[in-house]
């Protein structure tokens, strides 16, 4: 009887130990995942800061004006801007998936599962210039820097998710790119050079890039 009680106690003790180790393992995995996500977001923000600097350096060399599209060119300036500014970031030659400066590690693409930074159609870049020149769209393409009235609020370049909005870093949709939702956070760069992790407004109908947000947000697409 005595030996039986000892064996029962040992089994219970073992089960408690296993449960504790399981909880500890879950906590460690969660902490590791959080640290990994923060590290990848930091990489994204660092890359975007350098891309922002390249755009502003381009403007300094071009009569203080931001990149503008060529009406005769079918390639849209909001992603083809990279060809105009990449030399200011130290890149030479043709764009490729090896251009890590223009790659956010969390980029999951949109209509295609291929990340933007691996997609030649988007010139191998996770970051989109605030230059959507479709009719009626607020943008800063081709503007003199002096025409941007609030550079600390006006977007310069951003993760593609800011167009939706969605989020690569704190996603409520997992790996899916639908539905859009308000306050999805994206890493964005501003005309004054600073970068932030910013909630993006969604009115429930129109893509975020089609309008400035309502009051309470710290960014805008227009130069006014």
Predicted segments with their positions:
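N-terminal secretory signal peptides that target proteins for export/translocation
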Residues: 1-4
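Amphipathic alpha-helical segments typified by the pilin-like N-terminal helix
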Residues: 6-46
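Short, well-structured segments within or immediately adjacent to enzyme catalytic domains
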Residues: 42-224
């Amino acid at each position: 009887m005595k030996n039986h009680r000892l064996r029962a106690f040992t089994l219970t003790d073992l089960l408690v130990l296993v449960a504790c180790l399981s909880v500890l393992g879950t906590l460690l995995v969660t902490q590791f995942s959080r640290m990994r996500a923060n590290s990848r977001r930091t990489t994204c923000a660092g890359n975007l800061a350098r891309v922002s600097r390249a755009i502003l350096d381009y403007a300094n060399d071009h009569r203080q004006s931001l990149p503008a599209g060529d009406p005769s060119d079918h390639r849209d300036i909001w992603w083809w801007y990279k060809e105009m500014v990449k030399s200011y970031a130290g890149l030479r030659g043709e764009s490729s998936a090896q251009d890590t400066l223009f790659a956010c590690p969390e980029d999951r693409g949109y209509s295609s599962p291929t990340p933007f930074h691996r997609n030649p159609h988007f010139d191998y870049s996770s970051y989109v210039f605030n230059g959507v020149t479709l009719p009626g769209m607020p943008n800063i393409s081709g503007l003199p820097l002096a025409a941007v009235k609030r550079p600390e609020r006006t977007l310069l370049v951003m993760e593609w998710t800011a167009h939706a909005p969605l989020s690569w870093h704190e996603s409520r949709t997992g790996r899916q790119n639908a539905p859009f939702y308000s306050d999805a956070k994206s890493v964005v760069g501003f005309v004054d050079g600073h970068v932030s992790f910013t909630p993006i407004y969604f009115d429930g109908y129109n893509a975020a890039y089609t309008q400035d947000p309502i009051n309470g947000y710290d960014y805008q697409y227009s130069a006014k």
